[in-house]
């Protein structure tokens, strides 16, 4: 009887979470040199050059999970950062938001090509992806090629362009914000901690894919 009750409670949490709105804010920024104080907002199909510096800021629901994944121009995968919901998950309806930097200023290196970034935000744990990346990081080159296919398949599971029953909508914020508060310290409002866009999903999944054209 206790097992049945526990299982029912678990299902109630999962179903309840899926019915909640889910979404995150992000800021994908670039600058020409590390010492530059001029930040540029990046979006899908933006052009970057070798030597440019990139930064990613994320604001997400504290009771959710986030994976930020990078696929290089030569097809290598890297889990840039991930955040897991607290284990003592109490009330996902509180809508508390956590802001953090998923990628600090990092220069983009050759070769040129398409640089792909995936932002995945879910209420359910991203356990499969996390385990695949652990194996990928330890595997030899030949093994990584096989695991890369499995990683992409796992990513595609959350991609609304591939899964017809999913939907995510991204839009630019009217004003850049820092930690959830409008920032007025600079003329253009864009500082190192700014988030500039919002992605809203449904059924417990929000997904954003950004491809940068590296020249």
Task: Describe each PLM feature range.
Residues 3-16:
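Sec-dependent N-terminal signal peptides
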């Amino acid at each position: 009887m206790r097992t049945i009750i526990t299982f029912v409670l678990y299902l109630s949490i999962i179903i309840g979470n899926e019915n909640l709105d889910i979404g995150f804010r992000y800021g994908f920024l670039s600058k020409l040199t590390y010492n530059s104080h001029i930040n540029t907002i990046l979006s899908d199909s933006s052009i970057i050059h070798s030597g440019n510096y990139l930064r990613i800021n994320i604001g997400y629901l504290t009771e959710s999970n986030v994976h930020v994944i990078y696929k290089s121009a030569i097809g290598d995968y890297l889990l840039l950062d991930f955040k897991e919901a607290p284990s003592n998950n109490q009330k996902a309806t509180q809508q508390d938001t956590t802001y953090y930097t998923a990628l600090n200023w990092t220069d983009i290196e050759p070769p040129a090509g398409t640089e792909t970034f995936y932002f995945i935000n879910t209420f359910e744990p991203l356990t499969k992806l996390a385990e695949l990346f652990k194996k990928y990081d330890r595997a030899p080159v030949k093994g990584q090629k096989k695991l890369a296919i499995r990683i992409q398949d796992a990513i595609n599971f959350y991609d609304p362009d591939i899964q017809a029953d999913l939907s995510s909508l991204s839009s630019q914020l009217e004003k850049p914000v820092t930690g959830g508060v409008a920032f007025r310290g600079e003329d253009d409002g864009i500082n190192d901690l700014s988030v500039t866009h919002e992605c809203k999903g449904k059924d417990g999944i929000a997904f954003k894919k950004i491809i940068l054209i590296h020249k």
